[in-house]
Amino acid sequence: MTVPKPLKKAFTVGTAAVAAALLSLPIAVPAGAEPAPAPAVGSTQWIVVGVPAASATSGTLTAFQRVGQQWKTVLGPIKAMVGDVGVGEGADGVHRTPVGTFAFDQAFGREPNPGTAMPYFQATTADWWDQDAGSPTYNTHVQSAANPSSVTENLYDSGPVYDYAVNIAVNPQRIPGKVSGIFLHVTDGTPTWGCVAIGRSEMKSLLTWLDPSANPRITIGVGDPALLPAQS
């Protein structure tokens, strides 16, 4: 497993210290959004995205690796772009990044697999993400020579932002209309349609670091930082 080179000196804190720090932080949850819980027991990789206000379109991303009872910073904090109407409760057709703690499932990119252990496919013009709430393949990856439904995103034609990406499993139950196609991907320097976006080299490093056996999670919230790992 490759750990990305930290962009600044890494720090290590014990679980108790992190929990105490968490309680002292000015954490806010946007109206209509559920508080972001800690990752499931067994997670040893955690990505935290924090924004200064629910209406903010950028914030920071920090990646943590759990070693024993300690969390170590392995990347960040780095700049991260979020939805062009900020963060809060997600919904199809609303460019808002969902708040909460979520798993990662499917990685992909226009570029070859950079060495990630996550399930990965190299996107072509035949790769789509179905966002049609009335489709039987809603909120899934679809391979088709032609557009498979009325509301889709072509994962190749969308351009360099999808050179490297991973799906944030915000709506794994695929509840129609709840939210679909929320990814962590490469930034083009502008706010997103609801995804989280970071620099290309950092995105590539994160993919090589992510390991499904570590039960990786991402937490998105409001605060400075939004949340810190406080898992016992």
Q: Model-derived features: where do they sit?
A:
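A conserved hydrophobic position in a structured secondary element of the catalytic/binding core
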Residues: 198
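Secretory targeting and sorting signals
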Residues: 1-33
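Short cysteine clusters
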Residues: 195
